[in-house]
């Protein structure tokens, strides 16, 4: 598992989460291809992930980066942390994320850390249970972040003031 990151001219932070070699067996032998999993974010709440496949590693990474830029979501952050603690799952991967006080840093492993870093989360406590397959962990993390709402948006939906729901 590689952790490659770079800044692009659009202001996005790009991280390579995983490159995997897969083999297709045919009559004449094996055909090797590569898959790449990447996450892209602006460090201010916009984040996306993508997967790319190709015969060459750089082409797979490029396809994954383009897919990640196309599939970006907006996350409502509470400053540099999450709004509230949450659980999420995808397949056999389960993730738990909770907000942390200023100065805590990102306490998360592997694929979750990459997603949270590019999203702009700087203080969080996170744990992955079950399968640690990076693809499923990234999916589960995204499900949790996508469902997170700010108290202001919840109050607006209910037609109440923020003080009434907190």
UniProtKB/Swiss-Prot annotation:
Gene3D superfamilies with a match to the protein in the record: 3.30.160.20, 3.30.230.10
**Span of the secretion signal?**
none
GO cellular component entries: small ribosomal subunit
**Domain of life per record:** Bacteria
Keyword line: Ribonucleoprotein, Ribosomal protein, RNA-binding, rRNA-binding
GO MF annotation, one: rRNA binding
**Every S5 DRBM domain range:** 12-75
Q: One Pfam family name from the record?
A: Ribosomal_S5_C
InterPro entries for this protein: Ribosomal_Su5_D2-typ_SF, Ribosomal_uS5, Ribosomal_uS5_bac-type, Ribosomal_uS5_C, Ribosomal_uS5_N, Ribosomal_uS5_N_CS, Ribsml_uS5_D2-typ_fold_subgr
GO BP field:
translation
Kindly state the subunit structure of this protein: Part of the 30S ribosomal subunit. Contacts proteins S4 and S8.
The family line of this record is: Belongs to the universal ribosomal protein uS5 family.
* Job description of the protein: With S4 and S12 plays an important role in translational accuracy.
Domain notes for this protein: The N-terminal domain interacts with the head of the 30S subunit; the C-terminal domain interacts with the body and contacts protein S4. The interaction surface between S4 and S5 is involved in control of translational fidelity.
Q: What is this protein called?
A: Small ribosomal subunit protein uS5
Name the source organism.
Answer: Pseudomonas syringae pv. tomato (strain ATCC BAA-871 / DC3000)
List the taxonomic lineage: Bacteria, Pseudomonadati, Pseudomonadota, Gammaproteobacteria, Pseudomonadales
Q: Which gene encodes it?
A: rpsE
């Amino acid at each position: 598992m590689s952790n490659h990151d770079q800044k692009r001219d659009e202001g996005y932070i790009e991280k390579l989460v995983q490159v995997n070699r897969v083999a297709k067996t045919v009559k004449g032998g094996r055909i090797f291809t590569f898959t790449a999993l990447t996450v892209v974010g602006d460090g201010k709440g916009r984040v996306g992930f993508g997967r790319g496949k190709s015969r060459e590693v750089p082409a797979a990474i490029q396809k994954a980066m383009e897919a990640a830029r196309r599939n970006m979501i907006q996350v409502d952050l509470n400053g540099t942390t999450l709004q509230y603690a949450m659980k999420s799952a995808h397949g056999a991967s389960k993730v738990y994320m909770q907000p942390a006080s200023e100065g805590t840093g990102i306490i998360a492993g592997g694929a979750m850390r990459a997603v949270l870093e590019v999203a702009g989360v700087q203080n969080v406590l996170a744990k992955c249970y079950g399968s640690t397959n990076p693809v499923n962990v990234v999916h589960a993390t995204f499900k949790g972040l996508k469902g997170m709402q700010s108290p202001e948006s919840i109050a607006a939906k209910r037609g109440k003031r923020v003080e009434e729901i907190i």
